[in-house]
Amino acid sequence: RGSNLTIHPLRNIKDLVYLGNMGIG
């Protein structure tokens, strides 16, 4: 997962936003 963070930072950010939206509502 760490290597993916450096290779695909945008994808990782999208994952965080997606999970954040799921948690909010």
From Swiss-Prot:
Its EC number is 3.4.23.-. Keywords: Aspartyl protease, Glycoprotein, Hydrolase, Protease, Secreted. It is found in: Secreted, Extracellular space. One of its GO terms (cellular component) is extracellular region. Transmembrane segments: none annotated. Glycans are attached at N4. GO terms for biological process: proteolysis. GO terms for molecular function: aspartic-type endopeptidase activity. This is Pregnancy-associated glycoprotein 59g. It comes from Ovis aries. The lineage of its organism: Eukaryota, Metazoa, Chordata, Craniata, Vertebrata.
